[in-house]
C-alpha cells in the first residue's frame, strides 16, 4: 500500500512539475501591423517594434517603428514613419539601426528622426541587424546569402557565400557572428528547406555549424540565453526553440506561423515575440531558471 501511495504521489508531482514547466503568456498587444522585430532601449525603458505594414520587400513608404512600454502599452504607434518594409532592429548608444529592404537606416533614438540611410546596392532583402562591441554593424541579406557590414562609414558586402543558407537572425559573440539561417529560397514547385545555426569567424570568415548543424526550421529571431545556448524562433513552423552549443534543439513554445525577431529579458526570464501574421507582440515567461548571461547589443 505504501508503495502504491508513493507511486501515485510521484505521478502527481511529475504532472505538477510538467504543468509548471509550460511557458506562460504574460501579455499580448494587438493593433500592430506585421511586426517583425523588437528591441529594448534601457536608457528610456521603452520597446521599439518594426512594422512592415504592407507587402514584404516593397518600397511603398508604409513601414513604421512603434514605441511601447515594457508591459506592451503602445506609447506611439507610428513613432517613426517613412520606412518601406522595416525588419531587423539593433540599438547602439542612441542610434537605432533598421534593416529596410536595400537600405540600412539610422534613427536618432532621442528624437525619432532618421539621420542616415546607407544604400546596399545589389541587395534584395536586408533582414536582421547586429552590432559588435567596436560599433561595427552587420546586416543579413537572406535571399542573396550575403552579410553586409557598416564600418567607418562604409556599407558594403562583407561575406557572400551560399553556405550561409539564407542568413536571417544575427548575433555577435566575441570573435564569432552567430547566424540563424532561414534556408535557401526554393525554386518554383520546390519545398522550402530547413536550416540551423552557423558560426562565422569575424577574423577569417570561416563558416561552421553550431554543434552538429542539423536543420531545425526556417529560423528568424536569435537571442542569447546562456553561454553557448540560444533562443531561436522558427518563422514558418511557428515555434520558439532552445538550441545549445551541440546543436540540440528543444521546442519551448508552439506558436502560430510568423514568429519573428524576438528579444529576451534575463532579469524576468521573459521573451517578447513579434507575431508578424497575427499583428501582435506576445510576452512569455519561460519556466526554466533564468541563467546569468550578458544581453546582446542587438
Identify the residue ranges that each predicted region occupies.
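Asp-box/WD-like beta-propeller blade repeats and closely related beta-sheet repeat scaffolds
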Residues: 23-26, 103-144
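Blade-level signature of beta-propeller repeat domains, shared across WD40, Kelch, NHL, RCC1
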Residues: 259-297
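Beta-rich, blade/repeat-based domains predominating
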Residues: 32-44, 55, 61-62, 80-96, ...
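Short loop/turn segments that connect beta-strands within beta-propeller blades
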Residues: 68-73, 108-113, 150-154, 201-205, ...
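A short loop-to-beta-strand structural motif that recurs across blades of beta-propeller domains
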Residues: 61-66, 103-105, 146-149, 196-198, ...
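A short beta-strand motif characteristic of beta-propeller blades
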Residues: 24-29, 73-80, 113-119, 154-160, ...
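Bacterial N-terminal signal peptides
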Residues: 6-15
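Short glycine/acidic-enriched loop and turn motifs that connect beta-strands
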Residues: 53-57, 103, 144-145, 184-188, ...
Amino acid at each position: 500500500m505504501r508503495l502504491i501511495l508513493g507511486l501515485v504521489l510521484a505521478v502527481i508531482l511529475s504532472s505538477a512539475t510538467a504543468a509548471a514547466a509550460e511557458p506562460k503568456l504574460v501579455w499580448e498587444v494587438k493593433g500592430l501591423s506585421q511586426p517583425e522585430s523588437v528591441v529594448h532601449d534601457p536608457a528610456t525603458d521603452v520597446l521599439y517594434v518594426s512594422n512592415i505594414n504592407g507587402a514584404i520587400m516593397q518600397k511603398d513608404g508604409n513601414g513604421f517603428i512603434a514605441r511601447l512600454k515594457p508591459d506592451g502599452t503602445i506609447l506611439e504607434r507610428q513613432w517613426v514613419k517613412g520606412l518601406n518594409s522595416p525588419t531587423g532592429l539593433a540599438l547602439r548608444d542612441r542610434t537605432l539601426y533598421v534593416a529596410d529592404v536595400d537600405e540600412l537606416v539610422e534613427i536618432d533614438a532621442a528624437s525619432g528622426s532618421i539621420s542616415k540611410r546607407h544604400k546596399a546596392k545589389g541587395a534584395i532583402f536586408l533582414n536582421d541587424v547586429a552590432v559588435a562591441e567596436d560599433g561595427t554593424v552587420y546586416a543579413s541579406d537572406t535571399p542573396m546569402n550575403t552579410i553586409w557590414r557598416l564600418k567607418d562609414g562604409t556599407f558594403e558586402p562583407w561575406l557572400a557565400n551560399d553556405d550561409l543558407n539564407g542568413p536571417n537572425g544575427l548575433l555577435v559573440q566575441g570573435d564569432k557572428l552567430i547566424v540563424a539561417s532561414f534556408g535557401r529560397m526554393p525554386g518554383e514547385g520546390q519545398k522550402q528547406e530547413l536550416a540551423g545555426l552557423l558560426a562565422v569567424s569575424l577574423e577569417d570568415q570561416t563558416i561552421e555549424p553550431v554543434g552538429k548543424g542539423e536543420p531545425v526550421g526556417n529560423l528568424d529571431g536569435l537571442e542569447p540565453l546562456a553561454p553557448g545556448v540560444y533562443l531561436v524562433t522558427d518563422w514558418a513552423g511557428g515555434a520558439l526553440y532552445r538550441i545549445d552549443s551541440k546543436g540540440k534543439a528543444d521546442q519551448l513554445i508552439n506558436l502560430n506561423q510568423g514568429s519573428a525577431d524576438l528579444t529576451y529579458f534575463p532579469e524576468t526570464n521573459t521573451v517578447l515575440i513579434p507575431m508578424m501574421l497575427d499583428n501582435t507582440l506576445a510576452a512569455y515567461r519561460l519556466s526554466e531558471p533564468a541563467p546569468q548571461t550578458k544581453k546582446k547589443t542587438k
